[in-house]
Amino acid sequence: MPETKKIAVIAGDGIGPEVVAEAIKVLKRTEELFGYRFEFEHGLFGGIAIDEKGTPLPEDTLRMCQAADAVLLGAVGGPKWDNNPKELRPETGLLGIRKALGLYANLRPAVVFDCLIEASTLKPEVLRGTDLIVVRELTGGIYFGEKYRRDAENGQIAVDTCVYSVPEIERIVRRAFEIARQRRKKLASVDKANVLETSRLWRETVNRIAPEYPDVELEHVLVDNAAMQLLRRPASFDVIVTENMFG
């Protein structure tokens, strides 16, 4: 008898409940076809949690997620809460759960199927063969740095601090190299090393780790160029690793 896996379900806001309901149908079908066993527990999160419990990430929801084997999250936020103070914004709960669960690696695959290739505004010959994955660092950088405002002579000044440590960079870069090793063995590290000190540290760390993976081809791409190349030649990318804001 297979072990029952606990899944914490937090549908969230907007289209979230609709999407999550369909995902649960798929999971239940896998139970029937492959013999898996899932136990679903539901919790409030995001805007709906603010409305009902006064916080975007209730303690009982966080405990439920910490006790689960996996978390199934729908969508967070909406215009209704856009003008809330920072601590009462749905996105604050999202950052909180990422930090609390140590969710440092965000894996974003992008595959273009031939049957859908005409649905894009890009030419089919540009898109054909696209199969890439973006590995985004998720718990560091500008999203988690110190934020504040202060009064100045000509009005307020707002500050968002971008901070990265070597261990934070190392763990996401190694994860990306491992993923590339299992795929087509190509890794593009995206940064802004011509301007940002955090990006220079990022690039130095990537270069130091690269010899551990001699079978993986590495290239460095500045983020603005990466955006252009994803439109011009998306099929040339295999694995992309980058920091929180760029991902």
Go through each PLM region and give its residues:
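Conserved beta-strand segments of alpha/beta enzyme cores
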Residues: 37-39, 106, 217-219
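N-terminal glycine-rich phosphate/adenylate-binding segment common to multiple enzyme folds
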Residues: 51-159, 245
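Extreme N-terminal starter segment of soluble prokaryotic enzymes
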Residues: 2-7
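Glycine-rich phosphate-binding loop
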Residues: 62-80, 215-247
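Glycine-rich phosphate/diphosphate-binding loop of Rossmann-like nucleotide-binding domains
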Residues: 8-25, 30-31, 154-224
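Buried hydrophobic positions in well-ordered alpha/beta secondary-structure cores of metabolic enzymes
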Residues: 13-16, 69, 135, 176, ...
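N-terminal beta-loop-helix "entrance" segment that forms/cooperates
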Residues: 33-59, 228-230
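Short glycine/threonine-rich loop-to-helix capping motif typified by GTGT followed
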Residues: 53, 197-207, 231-237
